[in-house]
Amino acid sequence: MKIFRYILLASLTCTLFSCGPDELIPESVPPVVNPGDKDEPGEEPEEPEEPEKIQLAITASLQDMQQTRGIIEAFAPGHEMGVFISTDRTDEAAGTKNASYLFDGKVWNAGQDVPVEADADVVAYLPYDKGVTDFKSVPFDLADQNDILYGTAKVTKDVPTASLMMQHAMTLVRVRLMKNEYMGTGLVSDMTFAGVLTSGTVDALTGAVTKDYNHGRGSVKVGGNYMLNDESPVIVDAIMI
């Protein structure tokens, strides 16, 4: 009987120990996700994307043709201008310098990003020269017979299109050749302006031309191989300072 009691007591003791509460395993706490968060738990947050900058657009028109001015009468595909942006109208552009804009027959296309970040002045010249660093000193050589155009406009972030009225900086010299009473064949093999200053710079802000006296005087060939006929006079145009 005692043996049974001992066995029963031992069994109860084991039962009491085995019926103790199980150890609680802590549940994982889900991460707090705020509204608008797109990153998965454990991932690094993405850098916010910068808003796309407003780009400068160009429209251009030509000043009415004058008898004594240059000879570009309309823009054609392939015409290319240089554009400067200045936010304080100082001697040097505070923003974009000498950006290229190429005309495709309909619109002017920028060769690079040209952001408009504040109210600004736009200064342009044509034809484009990648060596130009200052819009107040655009070089020219009469040997190239380029009609130098210049123009300015104002833009803002709300109105980022520069409406440029391009003006002629150079002078057009027009010569009419006639045979009249000349008894010879009437062949003009060469036409040259001699003893003239041939180079200088143009201020694209004002159109002022500065002659290069250090370069000296030279000759400018403007054509040749003309057969004179009074019924149809030969007209020769030359770009001069």
Residue positions per predicted region:
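Sec-dependent bacterial lipoprotein signal peptides
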Residues: 1-17
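Sec-type signal peptide cleavage vicinity
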Residues: 18-241
